[in-house]
Amino acid sequence: MYDGVPFSGKLVKLRLKSNALSYGPIPEPDTEIEQKLEVSVKKKTARLSCYNFGNGAKYLLNQVYVRRESEKDIRDILAMFEAAFSAYEPTGFVCDGGSWELVLTNDKRERFHYEGTLCTDFSWQGESVSDRLRSILDWSKLWAFAPALEEEADAGSKTDDEDTLMWHTNVVREEGKP
């Protein structure tokens, strides 16, 4: 989908589809699997549509959030995307993880297409683009380019060492050896 062209012009609309489907067991029908975000200058809105896995043949629309945003918030979001994708260079692609697809439309109605893995975030002015979007839109569950870290992973741990150990619990042993 990426057409190899950095964004140019004045950004007026963005559409970001984040899909969490990855290698592994089939999700439960009520598991949220896809989010679609649309931000538009013309409508001065941000719209987030959330889809569940359903029966696997077609995702089921679960929730839709539509918010009228201030002109400043819309400008901040679009300026961030203009800057990030004017100098865009593709990053590595992880084939067993989720993915994102982005379409940016400029004031001349030219469309620019980008894609990547749902774990590769971007930085803008030293801040995560995904985190900045979540903050401006006040949608903490927004995935964008990289889902927010789950706070539950840290629950009950007193040190960073305990969190690190969570990732090293699988040990392969030969039968009969301790």
Residue ranges and their predicted role:
Residues 1-30, 34, 56-178:
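Short, well-ordered, aromatic-rich surface patches in folded extracellular/luminal domains
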Residues 43-54:
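N-terminal glycine/threonine-rich, aromatic-flanked beta-hairpin/loop signature
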